[in-house]
UniProtKB/Swiss-Prot annotation:
Name of the molecule in the record: Putative 3-methyladenine DNA glycosylase
InterPro entries: Formyl_transferase-like_C_sf, MPG, MPG_sf
Source organism of the structure: Lactobacillus johnsonii (strain CNCM I-12250 / La1 / NCC 533)
GO molecular-function terms, A-Z: alkylbase DNA N-glycosylase activity; DNA binding
Primary enzyme class: hydrolase
Name of one Pfam family that matches: Pur_DNA_glyco
The entry's keywords: DNA damage, DNA repair, Hydrolase
Length: 208
């Protein structure tokens, strides 16, 4: 798949929005674990106070953001790991964080990996999603998507009723401008979106 083209040549916000409805899958060597992407956040580089590359910060820890579009940037916070894909040309450190998936295949294994958690608690957040997939290290950090056990189906996507743009989660409120920027994109009404209220959940999970 031409991930480089998909993850470049347009804004990172557009890329993040376009990921919604597409299938993210992981081959663990025994089976394919997969789900529909329902929540993604854009991080727009050196000007973005919430980005790991803000101000041009560059280190071995965030090098993935500086790689060509379609490279993996996997990082950890506490015991959790997070799945980012770099966007834009090499040296332009922007990326998209996949925050949640609506599970499709390998669900029993996901439940086991999440110690028995079921329903939305299975994958309704970036750390939970990676735990459900069984990712417990940064092994695939810096690797091109094409050379990894991960796959994003850029040729097909589910039809979505409505995409909503919201402020990102966990952003430092000391900078109101960036804290309130609507760079998080969700499938409206999907129960696996990380902070959705029960009254807002749709029976069709927001798909047509």
């Amino acid at each position: 798949m031409n991930y480089t083209e998909f993850f470049t040549n347009r804004s990172t916000s557009e890329i993040s929005k376009d990921l919604l409805g597409r299938t993210l899958s992981y081959n663990n060597g025994e089976e394919i674990l997969s789900g529909t992407i329902v929540e993604a956040e854009a991080y727009v580089g050196v000007k973005d106070r919430a980005a790991h590359s803000y101000g041009g910060r560059r280190s071995p820890a965030n090098e993935g953001l500086y790689r060509p579009g379609g490279s993996l940037y996997i990082y950890s916070q506490r015991q959790y790991f997070f799945f980012d894909v770099s966007c834009q040309e090499e040296g332009e450190p922007q990326g998209v964080l996949i925050r949640a998936i609506d599970p499709l295949t390998g669900i029993d294994t996901m439940i086991k990996n999440r110690s028995g958690k079921t329903g939305p608690l299975l994958t309704n957040g970036p750390g939970k999603m990676m735990q459900a997939l069984g990712i417990t290290s940064r092994k695939w950090d810096l690797v091109d998507l094409n050379d990894s056990p991960f796959d994003i189906d850029i040729d097909h996507k589910r039809e979505i009723e409505e995409i909503v743009a919201l402020p990102r989660v966990g952003i430092n409120q000391s900078d109101p401008e960036w804290a309130q920027k609507k760079l998080r994109f969700i499938v409206s009404g999907n129960p696996y979106v990380s902070d959705i209220k029960k009254k807002d959940i749709k029976k069709n999970h927001g798909f047509i």
